């Protein structure tokens, strides 16, 4: 059975291993200081929130999400990061995390819950196409 809970101080090592796996999947990484800053922000739970998914007591998935204002409607929930350990994929971990974030969004009363993925991430998109609606938007990043 998959158990989902908020991140706790004792989760640091397992969280960081999964967070680094997530960054490696997207061929990016950050300094150790950035991991420390992110971990501290997740534990504070003010600007960003974190969840862990466990199978048989082992952390196998993480989700980071935040709430933000929108210009034309009520606040939104953005699923910023979602990662499942490769050996735990296909067992419902990502779905459990997505559902847990949805519950947090409902409890907060937000109007919209959304996330992004790479266009060629076929396994993730197969899941997302089953549980959510693709709206056809394309994202652009302007380097500052």
Enumerate the language-model features and the residues they cover:
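Conserved acetyl-CoA binding element of GNAT-fold acetyltransferases
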Residues: 75-86
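Conserved acetyl-CoA pyrophosphate-binding loop and the N-cap/start of the following alpha-helix
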Residues: 88, 92-100
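Acetyl-CoA-dependent GNAT
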Residues: 6-74, 98-99, 135, 141-144
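Conserved active-site alpha-helix within GNAT-family acetyltransferase domains
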Residues: 95, 119-138
């Amino acid at each position: 059975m998959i158990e989902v809970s908020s991140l706790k101080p004792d989760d640091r090592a397992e969280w960081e291993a999964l967070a680094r796996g997530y960054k490696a999947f997207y061929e990016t990484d950050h300094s150790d200081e950035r991991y420390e800053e992110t971990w501290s922000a997740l534990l504070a739970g003010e600007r960003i929130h974190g969840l862990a998914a466990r199978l048989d007591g082992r952390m196998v998935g993480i989700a980071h999400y935040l709430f933000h204002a929108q210009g034309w409607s009520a606040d939104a929930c953005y699923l910023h990061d979602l990662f499942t350990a490769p050996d735990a994929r296909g067992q419902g971990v990502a779905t459990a995390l997505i559902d847990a974030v949805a519950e947090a969004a409902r409890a907060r009363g937000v109007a919209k819950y959304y996330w992004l993925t790479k266009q060629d991430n076929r396994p993730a998109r197969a899941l997302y196409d089953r549980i959510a609606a693709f709206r056809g938007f394309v994202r652009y990043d302007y380097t500052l």
